[in-house]
């Protein structure tokens, strides 16, 4: 079976159907978005999507969460959803080829591919995949995500997976890059204790709320990252009901781990590293257990959040 019989679809596909009225069905009034084919449901694995402002540390968070899940004995697949394809390099120690790269190499004849052509084993057995994307300024990243899941299912690579993590490009909340939400049980937002990332988190929370009306995804909470304090995040949470679920401090050793192309679980076991590892393990355990109720938060209007944040 050919997944992409026409490479031009990567540049023109704004949704899975060129009929806009069909695309909007079931996904909210006025929505023109990539739709989830019922045949592409991932199955029994727990699926989490990681969102947040560009540069806030989503890939660092995703990779270390993946390792934490693997340390808890789970079989983990991390899917990078950014054309930069740099989500998994601390796990694999290299920039792996993307799904789009390997499909292009066989002229989009997916039946010629083997699983090892596009899925790579990383640290502690975490399986890694980079979806890639269309050329800059063209096409729809959500279409690529859909085709990636389709390829995984064709090769039966999801059947033995316990946890799937989607690491999603920046703070884009268009139909395309909201596509991982259609597969997810929970969506987590990474934010620092500053105006820009909380402002982005508020808009992402609104996108998650919109998707939750027609899909099973629910907001899981905010992961405070690169933050000594959390007062602004907590102020936002008190106003919206969107709670903070983890706090990862602003440590230089975390920056160094990226430069060393290593996860935090591979760094020298100093007291501060051990504390961060324990926070990741605690968060992974809570995400697996799912004891915390989903967040029914109330995102703010832009003007309201502008007025809320800051020092009195």
Curated annotation (Swiss-Prot):
GO terms for biological process: light-independent bacteriochlorophyll biosynthetic process; photosynthesis, dark reaction. Its EC number is 1.3.7.7. Pathway: Porphyrin-containing compound metabolism; bacteriochlorophyll biosynthesis (light-independent). It is an enzyme of class 1 (oxidoreductase). Keywords: 4Fe-4S, ATP-binding, Bacteriochlorophyll biosynthesis, Chlorophyll biosynthesis, Iron, Iron-sulfur, Magnesium, Metal-binding, Nucleotide-binding, Oxidoreductase, Photosynthesis. It comes from the Bacteria. SUPFAM superfamilies: P-loop containing nucleoside triphosphate hydrolases. ATP binds at residues 55-60, 84, 225-226, 249-251. Mg(2+) binds at residue 59. It catalyses: chlorophyllide a + oxidized 2[4Fe-4S]-[ferredoxin] + 2 ADP + 2 phosphate = protochlorophyllide a + reduced 2[4Fe-4S]-[ferredoxin] + 2 ATP + 2 H2O. It holds the Pfam family Fer4_NifH. Its cofactor is [4Fe-4S] cluster. Binds 1 [4Fe-4S] cluster per dimer. [4Fe-4S] cluster binds at residues 140, 174. Gene3D superfamilies: P-loop containing nucleotide triphosphate hydrolases. InterPro entries: NifH/chlL_CS (IPR030655), NifH/frxC (IPR000392), P-loop_NTPase (IPR027417), Protochlorophyllide_ATP-bd (IPR005971). One of its GO terms (molecular function) is ATP binding. Belongs to the NifH/BchL/ChlL family. Component of the dark-operative protochlorophyllide reductase (DPOR) that uses Mg-ATP and reduced ferredoxin to reduce ring D of protochlorophyllide (Pchlide) to form chlorophyllide a (Chlide). This reaction is light-independent. The L component serves as a unique electron donor to the NB-component of the complex, and binds Mg-ATP. HAMAP family: ChlL_BchL. Homodimer. Protochlorophyllide reductase is composed of three subunits; BchL, BchN and BchB. This is Light-independent protochlorophyllide reductase iron-sulfur ATP-binding protein.
């Amino acid at each position: 079976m050919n997944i992409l019989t026409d490479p031009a679809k990567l540049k023109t596909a704004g949704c899975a159907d060129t009929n806009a009225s069909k695309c909007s069905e079931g996904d909210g009034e006025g929505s023109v978005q990539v739709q989830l084919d019922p045949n592409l449901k991932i199955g029994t694995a727990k699926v989490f999507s990681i969102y947040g402002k560009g540069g806030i540390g989503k890939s660092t968070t995703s990779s270390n969460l993946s390792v934490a899940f693997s340390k808890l004995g789970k079989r983990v697949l991390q899917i990078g959803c950014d054309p930069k394809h740099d989500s998994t390099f601390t796990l694999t120690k290299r920039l792996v080829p993307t799904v789009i790269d390997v499909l292009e190499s066989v002229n989009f004849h997916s039946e010629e591919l083997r699983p090892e052509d596009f899925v790579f084993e990383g640290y502690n057995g975490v399986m890694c995949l980079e979806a890639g994307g269309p050329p800059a300024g063209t096409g729809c990243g959500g279409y690529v995500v859909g085709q990636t899941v389709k390829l995984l299912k064709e090769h039966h690579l999801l059947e033995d997976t316990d946890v799937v993590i989607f690491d999603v490009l920046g703070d884009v909340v268009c139909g395309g890059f909201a596509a991982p939400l259609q597969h997810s049980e929970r969506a987590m937002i990474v934010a620092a204790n500053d105006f820009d990332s909380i402002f982005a988190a508020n808009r992402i929370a609104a996108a998650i709320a919109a998707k939750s009306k027609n899909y099973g995804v629910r907001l899981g909470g905010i992961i405070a990252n690169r933050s000594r304090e959390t007062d602004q995040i907590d102020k936002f949470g008190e106003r919206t009901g969107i709670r903070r679920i983890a706090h990862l401090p602003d440590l230089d050793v975390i920056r160094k781990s990226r430069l060393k192309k290593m996860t935090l679980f591979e760094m020298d076991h100093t007291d501060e590293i051990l504390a961060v590892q324990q926070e990741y393990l605690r968060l992974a355990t809570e995400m697996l257990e799912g004891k915390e109720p989903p967040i029914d938060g109330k995102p703010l209007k832009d003007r309201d959040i502008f007025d809320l944040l800051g020092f009195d």
